[in-house]
């Protein structure tokens, strides 16, 4: 994920994917759309090196939707990890994925939120997926605080932190 000089004033960021075969647009566009991104165009380049398998580099010019103006360069590590996980099939591709950029949380926490919503539906929650997603997106600061609280509370590598003050500043 990078930006060229001419891209900054237009709010455009470039995403480059390197793979052994061409990614079909119908496969990648829903992934990017569910992350809240708009794809402006795509430039594929095929690389031929003798004695090696062919590689394809696809460069996409992207930006956030009008409703979600975020600096993609500041979130490029999170974004690239989520795209990779989605392409590999370990990150569900649905509209909850917008929380990754909106709330600035990692993809595995978005997966946790997806699972908690599904569990709630099994228990009889009357709220549909889009209703819950819209509520969470509208309160992205709360989502970020709750996922931060969850990490501090349950991550075994974090010891001795007091969770009582984690959300206080953001929730006031």
Residue spans for each PLM region:
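Non-catalytic interaction/regulatory segments
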Residues: 1-37, 41-172
